[in-house]
């Protein structure tokens, strides 16, 4: 099972992807709200398919791939280990990303963050509105499928915006610790917003769980 810790998320798969001798299988996390709770901004059909089909597929495929990887390790088959890396990255990243995404959303979300997170956003982006514009632009600008992210650069102590293709996990790709992720795969919005990704990006700000994002930020500052 993927840990629900809020800091260093991508490192939580390290035991499973490295030493597999006593690994536990990953499982699909429960949503902290009903499928229809984010309406009208994200409808119930999208949420049901996104969680119970798409995320579940990443979990199942990750478990299968890890079993194959364990067999390759036991056999000392380096070629097979290398060949399995893309599937580990894709399905492991999909599991990490979606496990963060669900907690980043809330039917009681929207508005602005408070306290230290808001001050950090103002410091690093000028204002909350400028931050929204930059993260929206980065997310809309993803070519094909991927994610827009607000991450924390622990070395610099600053917030940064980044975009990752496909299911590449933010921390494993950039070193940034994920705080807020926006899924811009078509399965996240197409049934409701068709091919108009900007409309989906406009709507999702109404359900951002700033309490969760703040918890992640405060944990990573320690």
Swiss-Prot record:
Post-translational modification, briefly? Nitrated under oxidative stress. Nitration coupled with oxidation inhibits the catalytic activity.
| Top EC class for this record | oxidoreductase
Q: Name one GO biological process term.
A: cellular response to oxidative stress
Which cofactors?
Answer: Mn(2+)
Q: What is its EC number?
A: 1.15.1.1
Q: Where in the cell is it found?
A: Mitochondrion matrix
3'-nitrotyrosine occurs at which residues? 58
**Transit peptide from where to where?**
1-24
CC per GO annotation: mitochondrial matrix
Catalysed reactions, semicolon-separated:
2 superoxide + 2 H(+) = H2O2 + O2
Renumbered to this chain, the signal peptide range is none
* Keywords tagged on the record: Acetylation, Manganese, Metal-binding, Mitochondrion, Nitration, Oxidoreductase, Transit peptide, Ubl conjugation
Keyword Metal-binding in the entry? The reply is yes
Keyword Hydrolase listed = no
Which residues are recorded as modified (N6-succinyllysine)?
68, 75, 122, 130
- The N6-acetyllysine modification is found at 68, 75, 114, 122, 130, 202
For Mn(2+), which residues are the binding ones?
A: 50, 98, 183, 187
| Family matches, as InterPro entries | Fe/Mn_Superoxide_Dismutase, Mn/Fe_SOD, Mn/Fe_SOD_BS, Mn/Fe_SOD_C, Mn/Fe_SOD_N, Mn/Fe_SOD_N_sf, SOD_C_sf
Annotated GO molecular function terms are: manganese ion binding; superoxide dismutase activity
Q: Using the UniProt record, give the first listed, main subcellular location.
A: mitochondrion
Cofactor note, please? Binds 1 Mn(2+) ion per subunit.
Q: How does it assemble?
A: Homotetramer.
Q: Which family does it belong to?
A: Belongs to the iron/manganese superoxide dismutase family.
Quote the PANTHER family the UniProt record gives: SUPEROXIDE DISMUTASE 2 (PTHR11404), SUPEROXIDE DISMUTASE [MN], MITOCHONDRIAL (PTHR11404:SF6)
Name of this chain's protein: Superoxide dismutase [Mn], mitochondrial
- The organism encoding this protein is Pongo pygmaeus (Bornean orangutan)
Organism lineage = Eukaryota, Metazoa, Chordata, Craniata, Vertebrata
Q: Which gene encodes it?
A: SOD2
């Amino acid at each position: 099972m993927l840990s629900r810790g809020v800091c260093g998320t991508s490192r939580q798969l390290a035991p499973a992807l490295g030493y597999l001798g006593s690994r536990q299988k990953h499982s699909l996390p429960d949503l902290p709200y009903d499928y229809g709770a984010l309406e009208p901004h994200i409808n119930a059909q999208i949420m049901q398919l996104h969680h119970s089909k798409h995320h579940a597929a990443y979990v199942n495929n990750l478990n299968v791939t890890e079993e194959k990887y364990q067999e390759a390790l036991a056999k000392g088959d380096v070629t097979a280990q290398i060949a399995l890396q893309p599937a580990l990255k894709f399905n492991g990243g999909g599991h990490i990303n979606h496990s963060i995404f669900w907690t980043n959303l809330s039917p009681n979300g929207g508005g602005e963050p408070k306290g230290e997170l808001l001050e950090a956003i103002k410091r690093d982006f000028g204002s909350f509105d400028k931050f929204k514009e930059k993260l929206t632009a980065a997310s809309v600008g993803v070519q094909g499928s991927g994610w827009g992210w607000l991450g924390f650069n622990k070395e610099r102590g600053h917030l940064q915006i980044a975009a990752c293709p496909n299911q590449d996990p933010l921390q494993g790709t950039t070193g940034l610790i994920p705080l807020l992720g926006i899924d811009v795969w078509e399965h996240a919005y197409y049934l409701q917003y068709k091919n108009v990704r900007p409309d989906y990006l406009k709507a999702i700000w109404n359900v951002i769980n700033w309490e969760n994002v703040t918890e992640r930020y405060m944990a990573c500052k320690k």
